Structure formats: structure tokens, C-alpha cells
Amino acid sequence: MPGIRGPSEYSQEPPRHPSLKVNAKEPFNAEPPRSALVSSYVTPVDLFYKRNHGPIPIVDHLQSYSVTLTGLIQNPRKLFIKDIRSLPKYNVTATLQCAGNRRTAMSKVRNVRGVGWDVSAIGNAVWGGAKLADVLELVGIPKLTASTNLGARHVEFVSVDRCKEENGGPYKASITLSQATNPEADVLLAYEMNGETLNRDHGFPLRVVVPGVIGARSVKWLDSINVIAEESQGFFMQKDYKMFPPSVNWDNINWSSRRPQMDFPVQSAICSVEDVQMVKPGKVSIKGYAVSGGGRGIERVDISLDGGKNWVEASRTQEPGKQYISEHSSSDKWAWVLFEATIDVSQTTEVIAKAVDSAANVQPENVESVWNLRGVLNTSWHRVLLRLGHSNL
């Protein structure tokens, strides 16, 4: 398309932070050290996980770049970046999380397919841009619309990004029209991240941000928006990112038997120490993140030192020095909380964290109960082992 192109090879990739752990080089998939996630409430752009399916698109001429709005609408049109920037701008603090976050731990139970991720395929950012609900009004679709006279019920986002899973075609995903037109769903066409222009890795010049939903639906390098009758038939909606039971394998899988995953479940992870960490005897600070999808707040984070028999509640913050309350009026409803608890360690100790969201959803105890062949949505209790010895902690 004019102004932007998806290259077929990897010779013009952007620079990346040297501390990122590279899980796949081509396409580039990497995550920061887990300790970086609890260093600040808002994750620095350079340390935000990178999830890609092909070479990073290149913008040749920003003024020529446009997004096509088409499909079941009366008046299809093109919007240039200046048109989108002329709409009211909103800043939304929202956590994005790859559905494969914590896949590596799931693969230790049984083999799974997918990029190996530790606990850092997640990040929290302030996204700036226009609300999708405002953009759709420009083509005659009012706010809070679930369906139209032309039969539209879904909104599909198509990327410039070309990927092998689509046989060289574009990456695409969709959400319901009711979510797209709901101003309180805060779906953005974002051109800023943490107050700066999006960089190439994160979707420059324009991306979708769908808060509370797995990252696969927040399409980067936006090419077109299609208003359609059925959900997107793209590979990543129909043959990936679905939650199957442990009994399903690659011989008996039926992709059409499951709906595409949208909201992510309640999740938490300990980030101040590694899965196995040497510590000195005495007090140890346990820090991590907790988040739930769908705009559900975190009701509490529990810490156990005895295998889950007894629990203590960790403190939770979004803003330093302010008590967190999981209500929309007093919290960033799409964003994680950071938690902290100080424990006394006198012997080898397994530390467990689990979160409970505002709908009383709780993380499952064992990874075995949520194992699936694609290794997605590992939200089991997070466990780390502290051993006594020499340590910098």
C-alpha cells in the first residue's frame, strides 16, 4: 500500500535493547528480563516484549499512508494519519499480553508448539490515539451498535504484515461490532506509546489496541478495517489462539469446535526472583504483576510458603504510595497491578503467587489442568524456589 510496505526478508530490522531475551530471531520474538517488569508501573518501550510473525514493515512516506474503511458500510473511505490525529485523542493505560506468556513452563509438562516465553511476554503501556468508536461514526455506524441493517456484526483489522501462516497474505483479526462501537471498551487506533510516537516494532504508524484481550487481536501496522457479517476467517482467528482441553492432540484436533480466545484470564507472576534463586537467610522481597482481562480488576494477590496450605495477602499498587482498589472509578481497569510481600527465608522455600480478580476468578493450581497443545493461557499458580546461598538480593 502507499507509504508503507511489508518486506519479504529481514535485512532492515530496527535496533533492539541488548537486555532482551531473544526467543526467535526471524521473525523477531523477545522478552525483557522479568525483573524489568517490576521496576516501573509503565513498561519502557524498549523493554516491552516483541511479538512478530514476519519482517517489520517499513514506512517510506508517512503522508501517503492511509487506512481503508470498507465492507458492509454505505460509504467506504480512506483515512490518512492526519485524519485520525484530528479526532479526539485518548490515553488509555492498558496491559498487553501474548496468549503464549509462560508457555515454557507449560512445555515442561508435555511438548507444545509455539515460541517459548518465560513470564515477560506482557507489558503495561499508556497508549494514545483515536477511539475506534469515533472512527466508525465517520462511516455511519453509531456508537453502541451490535449489528447494522446491512448485516454487519464484526470488525476486522488487516495488517500490512505478511506472514507464512496466511500463505504470504496479511495478518488479520476481528472483534465484535458491539465492542468496537462501545466507547467504554476503549478500543484505540493508537499512534503513541508512553507519550512517544509508536516505534516500528510496536506498529508504527498505526495499530489497534484492544484492552483486556489477548495481544493477538491488537493488530499492528494497520492497513484496513473491514466491517463484516462474520468473525474474521484469518488463520490466527480460526486455527490458532483457541483454548483446547488437555485431551486434544494434533491427531484429533477440530479447530471449528472452539471459539477464538478474546479476554485473557486472571494471571500473576513473581518477577523479583528467578524460578530458582539463591538468597541469603533473612527477609526477601517478593514482587510481581497481576492482571485480568475484560476490564476486571485484581481483588487480591495471595502468597504461600507451604505449598498452598496457608496464604498471606500481598500489597498492590498502580501508583506509588496509593492504595489500589479494584473499582473502575479508582483504578486503571485495563492495567496490571504490581504486588509486593516481604517474607522471611531460613531454609529452601517454594514461594507461590496466585491472583483473584473482581469477579472472583482465581488462577488454577496446576499447569496440568490447563495444558493445551498450543501452550496458550498458562495461568497456573506461579512458583519460584529460593535456596540459601550467596546472593546479591
Swiss-Prot record:
Annotated protein name in UniProt: Sulfite oxidase
Catalytic activity: sulfite + O2 + H2O = sulfate + H2O2
Subcellular location as annotated: Peroxisome
Enzyme Commission number(s): 1.8.3.1
InterPro entries named among the record's database cross-references: Ig_E-set, MoCF_OxRdtse_dimer, Mopterin_OxRdtase_euk, OxRdtase_Mopterin-bd_dom, OxRdtase_Mopterin-bd_sf
Residues where Mo-molybdopterin binds: 49-53, 98, 159-161, 202, 207, 218-220
Subunit structure: Predominantly monomer; also homodimer.
Keywords from the named record: Metal-binding, Molybdenum, Oxidoreductase, Peroxisome
Region (Disordered): 1-27
Domain of life, source organism: Eukaryota
Origin organism lineage: Eukaryota, Viridiplantae, Streptophyta, Embryophyta, Tracheophyta
Motif mapping: Microbody targeting signal: 391-393
Gene3D superfamilies: 2.60.40.650, Oxidoreductase, molybdopterin-binding domain
Coiled coil: none
Residue segments, region Homodimerization: 243-393
